[in-house]
């Protein structure tokens, strides 16, 4: 039989287009229709080629012919969802649950589909069952808390977030979910308090922290109203990442926005000795000294900058002033 040859060609990428892969997989399956691997690979090839209607038919057959494989139910449900048939997707997942019991990946799909179809109460029931099955998993409490939040049951949502934090008070996913909850309720003091915890975590990328701080400070009125909390956030970053250029600029910018020019100037001067030298810091020092009308200091730092960056025209212009 040529079936293995066609299968190997398709499986090893020996084709020019996804449609050609489908044809190779189809030939392998047609030559040996009893081989479930050929059948599944044919369905996968159709999905990769974006031929979802045909893939749906294949996975319907696979579910019937091989009902003991939960992955067939997962993919069939995903295809129904892609076809905007969430009810059929839920029926498929219910069938899987009856046959296999609760499988985390299928339960997650089911909850998401229940939320998408506005069946929040049913999604809550699913999440409660998950929590009861594994009460010491923080993420399970977070999921249930998120669903309570969607249902506007805030006290129950907070209780679940609290339980998650009791299990692991530093879990970033839990803290992010709690921050989103407070943001949705416009409880900004609570949001900033949780954000401070996030800023103290090494697990949250610095880039994300900087982006969040920028979002908070982009609104001048918000900046004024919550200045002390935002100052605390900026200070937290400055302490944790004292030598990161992005944080130096963030903290200096915060000091300047706060009217603390002398402190910003002192911060930049500390970093003039950094290696390799950063022309941005020299430029900032010269600009602030110029604004403060310290001509002797301007000349001093322009001279130092030119020694390090002789090709930079703007430093020559500064010396000219």
Residue positions per predicted region:
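Conserved structural position within tetratricopeptide repeats
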Residues: 1, 26-30, 60-64, 94-98, ...
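Amphipathic alpha-helical repeat scaffolds of TPR domains
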Residues: 3-10, 200-220, 243-246, 250
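Structural signature of tandem alpha-helical TPR/SEL1-like repeats
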Residues: 13-27, 49-61, 83-95, 117-129, ...
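Short coil turns that delineate tetratricopeptide repeat
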Residues: 1, 33, 67, 101, ...
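TPR/TPR-like (Sel1-like) alpha-helical repeat modules
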Residues: 98, 183-205, 214
């Amino acid at each position: 039989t040529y079936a293995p040859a066609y299968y190997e060609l398709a499986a090893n990428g020996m084709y020019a287009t996804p449609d050609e892969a489908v044809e190779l997989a189809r030939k392998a399956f047609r030559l040996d229709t009893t081989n479930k691997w050929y059948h599944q690979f044919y369905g996968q090839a159709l999905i990769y080629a974006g031929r979802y209607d045909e893939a749906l038919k294949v996975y319907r057959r696979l579910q019937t012919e091989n009902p003991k494989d939960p992955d067939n139910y997962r993919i069939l449900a995903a295809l129904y969802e892609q076809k905007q048939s969430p009810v059929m997707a839920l029926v498929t997942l219910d069938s899987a649950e009856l046959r296999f019991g609760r499988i985390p990946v299928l339960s997650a799909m089911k909850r998401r589909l229940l939320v998408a179809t506005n069946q929040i109460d049913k999604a809550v029931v699913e999440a409660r069952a998950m929590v009861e099955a594994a009460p010491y998993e923080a993420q399970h409490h977070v999921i249930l808390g998120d669903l309570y939040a969607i249902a506007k049951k805030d006290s129950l949502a907070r209780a679940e977030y609290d339980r998650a934090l009791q299990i692991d008070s530093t879990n970033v996913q839990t803290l992010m979910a709690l921050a989103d909850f407070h943001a949705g309720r416009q409880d900004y003091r609570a949001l900033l308090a949780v954000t401070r915890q996030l800023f103290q975590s090494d697990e949250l990328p610095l880039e994300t922290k900087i982006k969040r701080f920028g979002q908070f400070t982009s609104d001048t009125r918000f900046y004024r109203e919550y200045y002390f909390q935002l100052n605390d956030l900026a200070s937290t970053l400055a302490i944790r990442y004292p030598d990161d250029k992005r944080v130096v600029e963030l903290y200096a910018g915060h000091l300047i926005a706060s009217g603390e020019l002398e402190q910003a100037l002192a911060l930049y001067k500390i970093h003039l000795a950094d290696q390799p030298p950063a022309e941005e810091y020299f430029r900032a020092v010269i600009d602030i000294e110029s604004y403060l009308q310290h001509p002797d200091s301007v000349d001093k730092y322009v001279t130092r900058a030119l020694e390090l960056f002789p090709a930079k025209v703007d430093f020559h212009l500064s010396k000219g002033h």
